[in-house]
């Protein structure tokens, strides 16, 4: 999965790529989702008012991070119907006045 963060002037801020198969010594998956990786890389200083481009609709944990970071718009390519937190994520984003746009033609 991928994520790209751009500011209100459409300037690139950060890119994130979800890492798979990253486990700690106890076998737990410790890889952050692409959304979280983007926010870590942006250091939180440039995310307010920005747009986040995602490969798939964000999970609830990523939605919380999106709201906290002050991101104003989320553009995504694919639905993730297997995510049990999808409806909670949608409610949180909608109630936080974040614009959500599905763009199946998104290419990155």
Regions found by a protein language model. Give the residues of each.
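Zinc-dependent deaminase catalytic domain
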Residues: 1-108
